[in-house]
Amino acid sequence: MFDLTGKHVCYVADCGGIALETSKVLMTKNIAKLAILQSTENPQAIAQLQSIKPSTQIFFWTYDVTMAREDMKKYFDEVMVQMDYIDVLINGATLCDENNIDATINTNLTGMMNTVATVLPYMDRKMGGTGGLIVNVTSVIGLDPSPVFCAYSASKFGVIGFTRSLADPLYYSQNGVAVMAVCCGPTRVFVDRELKAFLEYGQSFADRLRRAPCQSTSVCGQNIVNAIERSENGQIWIADKGGLELVKLHWYWHMADQFVHYMQSNDEEDQD
């Protein structure tokens, strides 16, 4: 179990929809500080959050998840002045625009990876941090393919690969930073938008999705926090249809164990 009491939480996402509902739940968990980094200002949402728990300090910065990593470093140097340290980093910025592959990949995958690479040194126990937890909010079509939203699905598959790689004990045993992901199923805020398929053959399915039964953003937000509280390093959760399910991870490359053993034996030989 991960206790959120007294934690310093940094949430990278637009403060609307799933991010807002997740933040509302976080504010009921007696966290000490909440930093919200988003692309546009939303003072009404910030005020709504503050009313839930006046004693929790809320900070806001406008943030472009696609900025260069060197700019992120300068940015987070300023963020850390207010936050002191970060216990939990939540990455929730997302874009589904099949007509703009670059923007979709940069927002959903590259920007998230650059954010993690920038923030990790502040959290790393061996670099003066306190350890903690990184939560990547992604999609169920990062687990199974989508013939309609091909670029979006590819970016979300990347998030899962990055999460599982970074959660390896090779890193966790050193830096004390656990990494997990929550895959959201179809959620109202997503399907309410005008959705375009990657190819015109899939457009009828994209149009039909807008009328499909979907979970509410509030239920999804609650289950994201539930997953955080139940999390262990490397876990992948599905938050869909009002429920929460732990993904059973599978290794397809049967040489993986032998390869890792080989690499570890070489490390031991180098130390000798």
Swiss-Prot record:
Active site location: 152 (proton acceptor)
Keyword Hydrolase: no
Entries under InterPro entries matching the protein: ADH-rel, NAD(P)-bd_dom_sf, Sc_DH/Rdtase_CS, SDR_fam
Entry-linked Gene3D superfamilies: NAD(P)-binding Rossmann-like Domain
Annotated keywords: Oxidoreductase
Residues the record lists as binding substrate: 139
GO cellular component terms given for this protein: cytoplasm
Nucleus recorded as keyword: no
Binding site residues for NAD(+): 11-34
Family: Belongs to the short-chain dehydrogenases/reductases (SDR) family.
Protein name (database record): Alcohol dehydrogenase-related 31 kDa protein
Protein species of origin: Drosophila melanogaster (Fruit fly)
